[in-house]
């Protein structure tokens, strides 16, 4: 008998033992021959759930993805959000078409109407989606001796992609980088899960053209655009020149204020303004002293 025949016989023996044990003990059992299922996106798939020892089974299916929980099946009936693409049977549920949003854990829960008998089994569903072209963040120039972080990411691949980096077309090792002659003078680390490439510190040998690759074991590995990064020396001369120019300008400003003060410019400005005095203008009277003019007459 071949290996496949032995495995099939063993599975049949375990299933038969489970059924007989449940009948003897009067306790229900729930079982699935597949606790991890992988299927390409848009294909159909069945999640099997086999149970025994229940006189009146009540079946529910729960879906968990991160912090999100939803009921796919309640009391042997598919719920409304899944009714158009999921069917229920006594041996499991079948998706007519799956998307990457269906990734997660499905739990088949079987109980009696009275609630005294209960069993469950969980199945992890992975919807296979090839990675998309990753995007990178690579600085055009970095200062030698500083820390530099290059990032690579893509968000379509399922399962999540792992990342690798290349410099001038040469693969960068994720461990023991100095074993490669091209990187013997470089100090870097690569996190294949997050896609981060970290130089700490940057050396003059780190100048070059960098790109990354994303792959998840399904479909073709995808490559990012290549971007050149230059490792440059700290411009000490430029910093000194900037400080000197600033000091010269500050000195000229102080000299200008002193010169204006010594020439009395500020004193003349104070005298010219005389802020405490007010000038009042009045309209001349129509009659001045020594003159008499009849302005009106009255007749009685």
Swiss-Prot record:
Annotated glycan sites: 185
Membrane topology of the entry: Single-pass type I membrane protein
PTM notes: N-glycosylated.
Organism for this UniProt entry: Rattus norvegicus (Rat)
Disulfide cysteine pairs (residue numbers): 49-108, 152-212
Keywords, sorted A to Z: Cell junction, Cell membrane, Disulfide bond, Glycoprotein, Immunoglobulin domain, Membrane, Phosphoprotein, Repeat, Signal, Tight junction, Transmembrane, Transmembrane helix
Function: Seems to play a role in epithelial tight junction formation. Appears early in primordial forms of cell junctions and recruits PARD3. The association of the PARD6-PARD3 complex may prevent the interaction of PARD3 with JAM1, thereby preventing tight junction assembly. Plays a role in regulating monocyte transmigration involved in integrity of epithelial barrier. Ligand for integrin alpha-L/beta-2 involved in memory T-cell and neutrophil transmigration.
Positions in the Cytoplasmic compartment: 260-300
UniProt-recorded Gene Ontology molecular function terms: integrin binding; PDZ domain binding; protein homodimerization activity
Origin organism lineage: Eukaryota, Metazoa, Chordata, Craniata, Vertebrata
Protein name: Junctional adhesion molecule A
A GO CC annotation given for this chain: protein-containing complex
Main location: other
GO biological process: actomyosin structure organization; cell adhesion; cell differentiation; cell-cell adhesion; cellular response to mechanical stimulus; epithelial cell differentiation; establishment of endothelial intestinal barrier; intestinal absorption
Transmembrane intervals: 239-259
Domain of life: Eukaryota
Domain Ig-like V-type residue range list: 28-122, 134-228
Entry similarity comment: Belongs to the immunoglobulin superfamily.
Entry remark concerning the domains of this protein: The Ig-like V-type 2 domain is necessary and sufficient for interaction with integrin alpha-L/beta-2.
Subunit architecture: Interacts with the ninth PDZ domain of MPDZ. Interacts with the first PDZ domain of PARD3. The association between PARD3 and PARD6B probably disrupts this interaction. Interacts with ITGAL (via I-domain). Interacts with CD151.
Subcellular localization(s) per the UniProt record: Cell junction, Tight junction; Cell membrane
Pfam families for this protein: Ig_3, V-set
Signal peptide: 1-26
Topology feature Extracellular, residues: 27-238
Modified residues annotated as Phosphoserine in this record: 282, 285, 288
């Amino acid at each position: 008998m071949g290996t496949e025949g032995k495995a099939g016989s063993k599975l049949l023996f375990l299933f038969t033992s489970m059924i007989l044990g449940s009948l003897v003990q009067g306790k229900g059992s729930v079982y699935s021959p597949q606790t991890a299922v992988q299927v390409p996106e848009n294909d159909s798939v069945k999640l099997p759930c086999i149970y025994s020892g229940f006189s009146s089974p009540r079946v529910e299916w729960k879906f968990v993805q991160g912090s999100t929980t939803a009921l796919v099946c309640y009391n042997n009936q598919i719920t409304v959000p899944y009714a158009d693409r999921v069917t229920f049977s006594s041996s499991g549920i079948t998706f007519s078409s799956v998307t990457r949003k269906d990734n997660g854990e499905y739990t088949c829960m079987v109980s009696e109407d009275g609630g005294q008998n209960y069993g469950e089994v969980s199945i992890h569903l992975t919807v296979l989606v090839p990675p998309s072209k990753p995007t990178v963040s690579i600085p055009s120039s970095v200062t030698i001796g500083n820390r530099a972080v290059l990032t690579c990411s893509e968000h379509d691949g399922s399962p999540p992609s792992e990342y690798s980096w290349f410099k001038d077309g040469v693969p960068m090792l994720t461990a023991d980088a100095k074993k490669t002659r091209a990187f013997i003078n470089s100090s870097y680390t690569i996190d294949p899960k997050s896609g981060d490439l970290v130089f700490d510190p940057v050396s003059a040998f780190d100048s070059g053209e960098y790109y990354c690759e994303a792959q998840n074991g399904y479909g073709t590995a995808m490559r990012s655009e290549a971007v050149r990064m230059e490792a440059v020396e700290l411009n000490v001369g430029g910093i000194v020149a900037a400080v000197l120019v600033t000091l010269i300008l500050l000195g000229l400003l102080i000299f200008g204020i002193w010169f204006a003060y010594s020439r009395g410019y500020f004193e003349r400005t104070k005298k010219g303004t005389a802020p405490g005095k007010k000038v009042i203008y009045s309209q001349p009277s129509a009659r001045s002293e020594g003159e008499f003019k009849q302005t009106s007459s009255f007749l009685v």
